[in-house]
Amino acid sequence: MTEFIPPGTRFHALPSPFPFKRGGALHGARVAYETWGTLAADASNAILIVTGLSPDAHAAANDANPAAGWWEGMVGPGKAIDTDRWFVVCVNSLGSCKGSTGPASLNPATGQPYRLDFPELSIEDGARAAIEVVRALGIEQLACVVGNSMGGMTALAVLMLHPGIARSHVNISGSAQALPFSIAIRSLQREAIRLDPRWNGGHYDDDAYPESGMRMARKLGVITYRSALEWDGRFGRVRLDSDQTDDDPFGLEFQVESYLEGHARRFVRFFDPNCYLYLSRSMDWFDLAEYADGDVLAGLAKIRVEKALAIGANTDILFPVQQQQQVADGLRAGGADAHFIGLESPQGHDAFLVDFDRFGPAVRGFLDAL
């Protein structure tokens, strides 16, 4: 079992024990993070970024690691999240394999990876861990907490669990609860991993690794991260050249199939399967309605921020834009100056990672007005 930690990653030790929402606790756990910009003397210019399922804390290039980050087009000097003005902190989610303690990490009690002995992970656990980093940096109140995809859930949990922790919020392609379609897709992804004989109840290693299950899980994910409009525009029904196919009568024939296969193969050895299972399930469990007798809008209305922006792509099938509209409506009911923007992007759920021409101005306009 392997962790994948970028150069320049910083670490914060969590309190020991660190209890989990659903029971159990970690001892000697840590959270991975990176920072950009300069914290103001009064610590009033801090922005927290909480991520989706797979990213590490390296959102953009910095002095510690000049390699491009996963949100390079959004974070940096003069960009939408302008590090000339803002002190930006990006936290890798608890439960990940990218630096924060997760199922692939060594259990100090045994000297072996936690595997399935890791406590049941909730979005709220990741939110509490992120705020431990914020407090350690001397920040009492954030100017803004920004979350995308799963990070949109984590950001809402941060705001719910820590009233007054942030003056504003940007929710990008996120939600206040998981929809049945998303739960169904993620359940199939987890099943694909667990049905791979090499998963072996979570006891795999680099030599006996559930690559087939991970590859199928990733393919299912990529299909939901994009849109039919993008598939049509990029691939249509174009077939592979004869020298790109093999003799398997049911093998790869169309370019879109080849794309999925290549994308999945690039991913499977760079993310731990057990971490994938834990983080995926934490998204299914998250529901702000739990905080308001089953009413998600009432749950959102309990959050207190001055301003909020919820944005998404109209082609997103995994976190559809009505969920971002719901976030804006609920926060507005709680007294926030909250707005929703649905963007006409062809790139589906992953649009926030690539469509900076649309997402960038929306985020920049909101932050510039703070």
UniProtKB/Swiss-Prot annotation:
GO terms for molecular function: homoserine O-acetyltransferase activity; L-serine O-succinyltransferase activity. The lineage of its organism: Bacteria, Pseudomonadati, Pseudomonadota, Gammaproteobacteria, Lysobacterales. Residues 52-55 are annotated as: Important for substrate specificity. It is found in: Cytoplasm. Its EC number is 2.3.1.-. Gene3D superfamilies: 1.10.1740.110, alpha/beta hydrolase (3.40.50.1820). The gene is metX. The active site is at 149 (nucleophile), 316, 349. Pathway: Amino-acid biosynthesis; L-cysteine biosynthesis; L-cysteine from L-serine: step 1/2. GO terms for biological process: cysteine biosynthetic process from serine; homoserine metabolic process; methionine biosynthetic process. HAMAP family: MetX_acyltransf. Homodimer. Belongs to the AB hydrolase superfamily. MetX family. Substrate binds at residues 218, 350. Keywords: Acyltransferase, Amino-acid biosynthesis, Cysteine biosynthesis, Cytoplasm, Transferase. Pfam families: Abhydrolase_1. Transfers a succinyl group from succinyl-CoA to L-serine, forming succinyl-L-serine. This is Serine O-succinyltransferase. The record marks 186 as: Important for acyl-CoA specificity. NCBIfam families: homoserO_Ac_trn, PRK00175.1. It catalyses: succinyl-CoA + L-serine = O-succinyl-L-serine + CoA. Residues 46-355 form the AB hydrolase-1 domain. One of its GO terms (cellular component) is cytoplasm.
